[in-house]
């Protein structure tokens, strides 16, 4: 079972990366594969309470790959890290099957609380370059997180989230309409003009008062 999972980690590279040409190339040169293999060994030791050895393997993998995966994180089958540099996955993170993440992704916490404090990523999700998914939230099955997004709340399944903070723009293949009342949007320039008009009005009133005093 364990070795079958390792082979699936190789196979998913060919499914997801058109640049992959041979098993030798993938096994020897793909840092994402090296990181996930190291994690599977570290996680097995972590479950047996061999915490120090598990963390040591994790840190060695981080040094060689630039990918940091806490050995306590639970990761499903056919997990693919594309490019990978700067990926961080926290201790209580749970990742389902057939999940893809790109470089610079953080699956992290939002504080120092104990217990479940990292995201749950369900099957078939995709998290694009530089996205940050933070806190004990759930990214639903088949969801997509856009590049550079910051996600702080649950993401429905089969939806697409973009932006800071992340917002749903597509769900079940349909665009989400968000009507904006533009007249209610803040306008700092207009606000400053109103302040200047008030100041000018007050100065004119003060000037007229001074003129009346001089006439007397």
UniProtKB/Swiss-Prot annotation:
State one Pfam family annotation. Answer: Hexapep
Protein keywords: Acyltransferase, Amino-acid biosynthesis, Cysteine biosynthesis, Cytoplasm, Repeat, Transferase
Pathway listed for it is: Amino-acid biosynthesis; L-cysteine biosynthesis; L-cysteine from L-serine: step 1/2
Q: Which subcellular locations apply to this protein? A: Cytoplasm
Q: Does the keyword Acyltransferase apply?
A: yes
Is-annotated flag, keyword Phosphoprotein? no
Q: Which reaction does it catalyse?
A: L-serine + acetyl-CoA = O-acetyl-L-serine + CoA
Gene3D superfamilies cross-referenced by the UniProt entry: Hexapeptide repeat proteins, serine acetyltransferase, domain 1
Give GO terms for biological process. cysteine biosynthetic process from serine
Q: How is its activity regulated?
A: Inhibited by cysteine.
Q: Which residues form the signal peptide?
A: none
GO CC term (a single one): cytoplasm
GO function terms (MF aspect): serine O-acetyltransferase activity
Stated EC number for the protein is 2.3.1.30
Query: Which NCBIfam families does the record associate with it?
Result: cysE (TIGR01172), EPS_EpsC (NF041874)
Q: Which family does it belong to?
A: Belongs to the transferase hexapeptide repeat family.
Query: According to its UniProt entry, what is the function of this protein?
Result: Catalyzes the acetylation of serine by acetyl-CoA to produce O-acetylserine (OAS).
Q: What is this protein called?
A: Serine acetyltransferase
- Native species of this protein? Bacillus licheniformis (strain ATCC 14580 / DSM 13 / JCM 2505 / CCUG 7422 / NBRC 12200 / NCIMB 9375 / NCTC 10341 / NRRL NRS-1264 / Gibson 46)
Lineage runs: Bacteria, Bacillati, Bacillota, Bacilli, Bacillales
């Amino acid at each position: 079972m364990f070795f079958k999972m390792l082979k699936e980690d190789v196979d998913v590279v060919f499914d997801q990366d058109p640049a992959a040409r041979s098993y030798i190339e993938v096994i020897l040169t793909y840092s994402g594969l090296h990181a996930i293999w190291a994690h599977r060994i570290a996680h097995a030791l972590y479950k047996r309470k061999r915490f120090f050895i598990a963390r040591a393997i994790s840190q060695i993998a981080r040094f060689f790959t630039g990918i940091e995966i806490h050995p306590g994180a639970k990761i499903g089958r056919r997990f693919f890290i594309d490019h990978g540099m700067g990926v961080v996955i926290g201790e209580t993170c749970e990742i389902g099957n057939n999940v893809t993440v790109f470089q610079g992704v953080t699956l992290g916490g939002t504080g120092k609380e104990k217990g479940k404090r990292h995201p749950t990523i369900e099957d078939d999700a995709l998290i694009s370059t530089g996205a940050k998914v933070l806190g004990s939230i759930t990214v639903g099955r088949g969801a997509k997180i856009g590049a550079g997004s910051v996600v702080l709340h649950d993401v429905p399944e089969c939806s697409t989230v973009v932006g800071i903070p992340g917002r749903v723009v597509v769900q079940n293949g349909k665009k989400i309409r968000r009507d904006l009342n533009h007249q209610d949007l803040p306008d700092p320039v207009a606000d400053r003009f109103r302040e200047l008009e008030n100041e000018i009005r007050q100065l004119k009133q003060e000037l007229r008062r001074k003129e009346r005093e001089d006439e007397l």
